[in-house]
């Protein structure tokens, strides 16, 4: 008799995706982040659902409702901090996942890669709108600054901003619609994840060597399920440590002050995971130019497959490209640091230099290095 998991219409889909899926035998721990992202998404949806039961999306009561969750709701403080710090873990895993794709050449699966970029934008939009909901000072002013960037769009910019605001400033209408979209978007993200996996399973996984692994495959279960469970334990331990020992480590103290449109905080900045893009935005004096650079800092990932000049897929055997990759990582850390600093000397020039380097490495230095490495292969 055939096993039910191979014949049942629903179970056979799960079976072919997570049980009998042929996987390359050489996958390293860098391939754990896909499943970790799935866990992060699950944690965020569950904690968010329970938070939404107690939250009120009204400017008069939003801040107090978050206080009420932390003080009066059973384990409300735990839900709130799991959700806030879960977002940080989500972005850590997300950036490591993208970095793995860049390093090992996974971007050559263009459909999977492009859906991944869409996912990145969707998660960033969700996180931004979620940051506005507690209605603290940084929530209000962050929303004001970021939504105002749309006014840089020629002709329709100002009307577009007022349409998003639902008035002439960030207020009740804006908060309500941000809550609605913040609730909806994770489910759209879940649907996109399904499409992402669908395209991935059409081609099969890449592997660290970057060479076809068809002759050497192993079943996903039990080998990679055990490996993934270890990853879950490590990540959830890190998240629990962060939540229980220093829940406000990654937050902004200004967000414990209720939103006040008449008092501007000395330094308006987004959450830490957007600081690299914020630094690129600030490094260009022109408003429209800054907005374009901000969008391009993420959208540039879409042209990475076109810029792949190497005869080898992975960077595993390309030491020159490896040096450039780690330089790019250092530049991103520098941009993240600069994004949190005030706009003054020497931070301005450091930010501008790092921004130029960021685009220069991806657009010119990496393709040129690949060509040089191809030439060296002939020796």
Swiss-Prot record:
Cofactor: heme b
Annotated residues for binding of heme b b566: 97, 196
Residue intervals passing through the bilayer: 33-53, 77-98, 113-133, 178-198, 226-246, 288-308, 320-340, 347-367
Gene3D superfamilies: Cytochrome Bc1 Complex, Chain C
Binding residues annotated for a ubiquinone, in chain numbering: 201
Compartment list: Mitochondrion inner membrane
This protein's UniProt keywords: Electron transport, Heme, Iron, Membrane, Metal-binding, Mitochondrion, Mitochondrion inner membrane, Respiratory chain, Transmembrane, Transmembrane helix, Transport, Ubiquinone
Protein transport found in the keyword field: no
Cofactor details (free text): Binds 2 heme b groups non-covalently.
UniProt main location, coarse: mitochondrion
Domain of life: Eukaryota
Topology with respect to the bilayer: Multi-pass membrane protein
An example Gene Ontology molecular-function term: metal ion binding
PANTHER family named in the record: CYTOCHROME B
Family affiliation: Belongs to the cytochrome b family.
Miscellaneous note of the record: Heme 1 (or BL or b562) is low-potential and absorbs at about 562 nm, and heme 2 (or BH or b566) is high-potential and absorbs at about 566 nm.
Subunit-level organization: The cytochrome bc1 complex contains 11 subunits: 3 respiratory subunits (MT-CYB, CYC1 and UQCRFS1), 2 core proteins (UQCRC1 and UQCRC2) and 6 low-molecular weight proteins (UQCRH/QCR6, UQCRB/QCR7, UQCRQ/QCR8, UQCR10/QCR9, UQCR11/QCR10 and a cleavage product of UQCRFS1). This cytochrome bc1 complex then forms a dimer.
Protein name as it appears in the record: Cytochrome b
């Amino acid at each position: 008799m055939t096993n039910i998991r191979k014949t049942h219409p629903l179970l056979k889909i799960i079976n072919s995706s997570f049980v009998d899926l042929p996987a390359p035998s050489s996958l390293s721990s860098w391939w754990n982040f896909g499943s970790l992202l799935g866990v992060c998404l699950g944690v965020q949806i569950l904690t968010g659902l329970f938070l939404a039961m107690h939250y009120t999306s009204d400017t008069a009561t939003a801040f107090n409702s978050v206080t009420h969750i932390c003080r009066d709701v059973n384990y409300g403080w735990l839900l709130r901090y799991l959700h806030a710090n879960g977002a940080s873990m989500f972005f850590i895993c997300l950036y490591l996942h993208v970095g793995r794709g860049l390093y090992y050449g996974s971007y050559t699966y263009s459909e999977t890669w492009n859906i991944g970029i869409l996912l990145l934008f969707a998660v960033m939009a969700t996180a931004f709108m979620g940051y506005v909901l507690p209605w603290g000072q940084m929530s209000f002013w962050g929303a004001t600054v970021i939504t105002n960037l749309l006014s840089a769009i020629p002709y329709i910019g100002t009307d577009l901003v007022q349409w998003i605001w639902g008035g002439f400033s960030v207020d009740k209408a804006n908060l309500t619609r941000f809550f609605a979209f913040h609730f909806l978007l994770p489910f759209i993200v879940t649907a996109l994840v399904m499409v992402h996996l669908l395209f991935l399973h059409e081609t099969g996984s890449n592997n660290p060597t970057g060479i076809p692994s068809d002759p050497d495959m192993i079943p996903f279960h039990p080998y990679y399920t055990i490996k993934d469970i270890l990853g879950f334990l490590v990540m959830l331990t890190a998240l629990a440590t962060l939540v229980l020992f220093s829940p406000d480590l990654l937050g902004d103290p200004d967000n414990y002050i209720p939103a006040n449109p008449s008092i501007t905080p000395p330094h308006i900045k987004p959450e830490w995971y957007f600081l690299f893009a914020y630094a690129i935005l600030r490094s260009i004096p022109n408003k429209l130019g800054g907005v374009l650079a901000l969008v391009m800092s993420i959208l540039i990932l879409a042209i990475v497959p076109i810029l792949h000049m190497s005869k080898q897929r992975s960077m595993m055997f390309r030491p020159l490209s490896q040096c450039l990759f780690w330089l790019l990582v250092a530049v991103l850390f520098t941009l993240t640091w600069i994004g949190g600093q005030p706009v003054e000397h020497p931070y301005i020039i450091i930010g501008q230099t790092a921004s130029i380097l960021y685009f220069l490495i991806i657009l010119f230095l990496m393709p040129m290095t690949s060509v040089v490495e191809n030439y060296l292969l002939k020796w």
